Amino acid sequence: MTTLTETTHPGGFLVWEAFRDYTRETVTIAAGTLEPGTVLGKTTASGKYAAHNPAATDGTETAVAVLWGKADASAGDVAAVALIRGPAIVNRHDLVFTGTLSEPEIAAAHAALVAVGILVR
């Protein structure tokens, strides 16, 4: 019998949002193949989004958004929808971080999301 594995769903991390036309926007993803719920940072120089990286110094070290659906930017920039502001509440267990983050780094990312109105519960 084949074993099926359910992957993340677009918007599956979202618990509540006030106004979807206000909280979500189409953004440009600069690099990587990212899953729904990936925490994003914004590159200061280009204004493009990429996976949050606390070790970076290009702007992506600060968590500012959450990717709505899968985005494959492995061959170049792609447009994708992201939750970029609140009021909204997301499930912390459904957020995706790239790399291996420490608990303090995850807590800092959660706090940065709260700063833009995205509550992490």
Feature map (PLM): residue ranges:
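Surface-exposed, low-hydrophobicity beta-strand/loop segments enriched in small/polar/acidic residues
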Residues: 1-121
